[in-house]
């Protein structure tokens, strides 16, 4: 089993069996697994980030109102379907995980309308690994009781990223 297949299997198990999953009891009873795109090696990138030295703290709106504070950490640029795309990577605290909330051409059609998230990994030689096969829906995609950061306008791209989680049926 590939790393991605194992990751998805573990996530499906968590969603279907764990009472801490974002699914309601009723949703868990009907759960047969999340919907995913097939694995795409073309949507895995090792990128050199442009680090932002001014440590700008920003407020990102939440799906339930209000906002959450985070920091713009770096800018990444990559080629996708013949288009140069630029996205901002965020970090809540120094040394904390890197977070990429984004909205793309699939949002609202093939994937959750508000957008998806990607946890960006550090790679060798000051590069970042962005593997969109691991892109995931925020918990509020499954249950309105969750509050989720909304991808900011700077992370909304027109290109379609057909990798990671797809839209989830509304079983509320």
What does each model-found stretch correspond to?
Residues 41, 72-74, 96-98, 114-116, ...:
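A generic structural signal for short beta-strands and their flanking turns/coil linkers
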Residues 62-113:
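Mid-length scaffold segments of soluble, non-membrane domains
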Residues 104-136:
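Acidic, glycine-rich flexible loop segments
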């Amino acid at each position: 089993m590939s790393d991605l297949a194992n990751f998805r299997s573990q996530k499906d198990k968590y969603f279907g069996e764990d009472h801490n999953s974002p699914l309601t009891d009723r949703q868990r009873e009907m759960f047969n697994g999340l919907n995913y795109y097939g694995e795409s090696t073309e949507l895995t990138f090792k990128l050199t980030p442009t680090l932002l030295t001014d440590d700008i703290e920003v407020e990102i709106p939440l799906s339930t109102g209000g906002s959450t504070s985070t920091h713009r950490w770096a800018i990444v640029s990559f080629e996708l379907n013949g288009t140069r795309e630029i996205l901002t990577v965020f970090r809540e605290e120094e040394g904390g995980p890197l977070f990429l909330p984004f909205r793309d051409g699939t949002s609202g059609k093939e994937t959750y309308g508000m957008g998806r998230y990607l946890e960006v990994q550090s790679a060798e030689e000051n590069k970042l690994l962005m593997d969109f096969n691991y892109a995931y829906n925020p918990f509020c995609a499954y249950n309105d009781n969750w509050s989720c950061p909304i991808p900011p306008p700077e992370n909304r791209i027109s290109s379609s990223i057909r990798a990671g989680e797809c839209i989830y049926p509304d079983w509320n």
